[in-house]
Amino acid sequence: MSQRGRLLWSCRRGMAELDRVLALYVHGAYQEADVSERQAFERLLDLQDADLWRCLTGLARPEDPALAALAAKLRALVGQAAC
């Protein structure tokens, strides 16, 4: 399985909303991301669904600055996709 395929598989969560947001990132911004952002994305995927949802909706802010920045980037991507 390719790295992209593995990531998309890891993006399959218990919530369709999370699936869509995470896949949007993999299909777009992930390819241009630097190594540290890619590592942060993989750490983000390690979060439980409820914690990930709170981070991506802005209800919680991760202590890890890289995860907080990535969550903000994902929120911005969703905003751009909605326009």
Swiss-Prot record:
Any single GO CC term annotated in Swiss-Prot or TrEMBL for this entry: cytoplasm
Protein's cellular compartments: Cytoplasm
Matches recorded under Pfam families: Sdh5
Keyword annotations of the record: Chaperone, Cytoplasm
Annotated InterPro entries: SDH, SDH_sf, SdhE_FAD_assembly_factor
GO BP annotations, alphabetical order: succinate metabolic process
Family classification: Belongs to the SdhE FAD assembly factor family.
Reported function: An FAD assembly protein, which accelerates covalent attachment of the cofactor into other proteins. Plays an essential role in the assembly of succinate dehydrogenase (SDH, respiratory complex II), an enzyme complex that is a component of both the tricarboxylic acid cycle and the electron transport chain, and which couples the oxidation of succinate to fumarate with the reduction of ubiquinone (coenzyme Q) to ubiquinol. Required for flavinylation (covalent attachment of FAD) of the flavoprotein subunit SdhA of SDH and other flavinylated proteins as well.
Protein name: FAD assembly factor SdhE
Encoding gene, per UniProt annotation: sdhE
